[in-house]
Amino acid sequence: MMMTEQQPFDLVRRYPGFDLRRYPSHTVAQIKVRASFDKAGNLAFRSLFGYISGQNRTNTSLAMTAPVVQAVTPEPVGRSSSAKDPGSQKVTMTAPVVQRPAGDDGFVVAFVLPASLTVDTAPVPTNPQVEIHTIPAGLAAAVSYSGGWSQSGFDKHSAQLHQAVLDAGLTLIGPPRFARFDPPFKPWFLRHNEVVQDVREPA
C-alpha cells in the first residue's frame, strides 16, 4: 500500500521553526475512536482503509493519499455527505492521514481524499462510523519531523511549533493536528510526520 497523492498546499512563507501554508478546501473520510493518542491511529486505520478499499455503496477502491490526520477539534467545520452513490469506483488515498482529539471521547482520525472528490462525489461509506466531510480552505503553520507516532513526539514538536508561531507574531486558532504521511509498515525512523496548526490571517 502506497500513498500516491499528496495533499496540495501553497507555501506562503518560511519562518524560523515552521512553514506557513495555505491549504485549499478538501474532502476527508473520518472516524471517531475511543483510544489513547498512540493507539487511535492504528484502531481507526482498519475502518478507513476498508472504506477506500471498497467498503462503500459502490464497492469503489480508492488510491491512498497522504497524509493521515489526527487532531484536536470535536468536529470539522464544513459540509458532510448524505449523498447516494450510484455505482462502483476506484478511489486513491491521499497523504497525510490526520488525527485530532475529539473532546473526552478519544480522537478523530481522517484520510484526506483525492482532490478530485467532493462530499457529493465521494463513495458513500457502508460503515456508519465513517463520515465524509468538507474541510474549508485555511492558513496553517506546519513543522515536519521524522520518527514514530508517539504522543511524546507529537507533544514535543507541537510545543516548539506553538512557541515559534507566537514568536512570529501570528495568532493560533484551535488545537494542532497530527499528520502522518507513511503506512504503518514503514520503519519508524523513516516516517515523515507533521504537526499542523491553524493560524489567523495576518492583518
Please report, for each region that a protein language model flagged, where it lies by residue.
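A solvent-exposed interaction/effector surface
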Residues: 1-203
